[in-house]
C-alpha cells in the first residue's frame, strides 16, 4: 500500500547555527556593556543582477517595493521589511523575513530582460549582534571603520570578520547583522562568543 502521508519539509530543516543556540544564549552579557548574539533563521535572500539604467533594473527596482541602492554601502528599505543591499554596481542582495513568494515575484518582474534573480537563502546565515558593546566586539577583528560618522544606521558593506568574508549591516544604533557564508557560521559564532567574553568582567578603571 502506498504511503500518501505528506511531510512538511519545514519541520525537518535546520538552520546553520541551530546547534549553537544554547552557547549563544549562555554568552549573553548584561549591564552597561551588554551584548547579545542570536541567529535570525530562515530569512529570504535573493541575489539580483541588472545593469543600472536598463529595463530589467527598472523592473526589479519597482518589484522590490523599495527600489535598488545606487552606491556602495547603501541599503534600500530596512530591516523591518524588505531591504536590498548594494554588493556591486549591478549586483544586489534582497533580504526579508521568510517569504518564498518573493522569488516568483522578482523573476516574473524581470521576465526575459537581461539580468538574474537567484534564491540565495541557503548561501549565508544571518547573525544578530546587539547591545552597547556590539561595535567593540566587532572592532576586535573587523578592519572597517565602524564609527557612526562613517558607518551609520542602515548601511551595509562587504568586509571581513575573524579572517572570513562577511556582509556587515548596521540595522540600529546598537544592532548589527553579520552574514557569513553558511559553511563559516560555526567559526563566526565561536569567534564572536570569545570576543564577547571580555565584556562580562568588570571594566578596569
From Swiss-Prot:
GO terms for cellular component: cytoplasm. SUPFAM superfamilies: Folate-binding domain. GO terms for molecular function: sarcosine oxidase activity. Its main location: cytoplasm. Keywords: Cytoplasm, Oxidoreductase. InterPro entries: SoxG (IPR007375), SoxG_het (IPR006280), TrmE/GcvT_dom1 (IPR027266). Inhibited by Zn(2+), Cu(2+), Cd(2+), Hg(2+), Ag(+), p-chloromercuribenzoate (p-CMB), iodoacetamide, N-ethylmaleimide, CN(-), o-phenanthroline and sodium lauryl sulfate. GO terms for biological process: sarcosine catabolic process. The keyword Mitochondrion does not apply. It catalyses: sarcosine + (6S)-5,6,7,8-tetrahydrofolate + O2 = (6R)-5,10-methylene-5,6,7,8-tetrahydrofolate + glycine + H2O2; sarcosine + O2 + H2O = formaldehyde + glycine + H2O2. Heterotetramer composed of subunits alpha (SoxA), beta (SoxB), gamma (SoxG) and delta (SoxD). Belongs to the SoxG family. This is Sarcosine oxidase subunit gamma. It comes from Corynebacterium sp. (strain U-96).
